[in-house]
Curated annotation (Swiss-Prot):
Membrane topology: Multi-pass membrane protein
Regions that span the bilayer: 30-50, 69-89
GO CC term (a single one): nucleus
Compartments, record wording: Cytoplasm; Nucleus membrane
Coiled coil stretches, renumbered: none
Sorted UniProt keywords: Cytoplasm, Membrane, Nucleus, Transmembrane, Transmembrane helix
Main location: cytoplasm
Organism: Schizosaccharomyces pombe (strain 972 / ATCC 24843)
Record's keyword annotation contains Acyltransferase: no
Organism superkingdom: Eukaryota
Keyword Cytoplasm: yes
Name of the featured protein: Putative uncharacterized membrane protein C191.04c
Amino acid sequence: MHSVCSIFLSCSHRVIQAKHPPFPLFHSYFHIPDFLSFVFPFVASPPLAFARRKLDHVPKKFARSIGPFLLIVFLFFNLFPTFFFLPFFPDTTKRPNLAD
């Protein structure tokens, strides 16, 4: 599930990035979501599996709330930089009207 979500978010982020390329100042910053969306499933899976085995004494209510929390954090890191800075970038898909 995490890998499907990360692939979808990574692709959607790249589509938006293609229409609104970042300024050089933010260029390295805008690759953070791509990096996180690729690394997240691999990094998060072993610790979560380990925690699930070792923390049997943790109440199930708390254990159920960790998954949605991680998903929210994951979505925040993927979508927030894109949509927060989007209005500040020029839309390079518009071509000048040569008839004027």
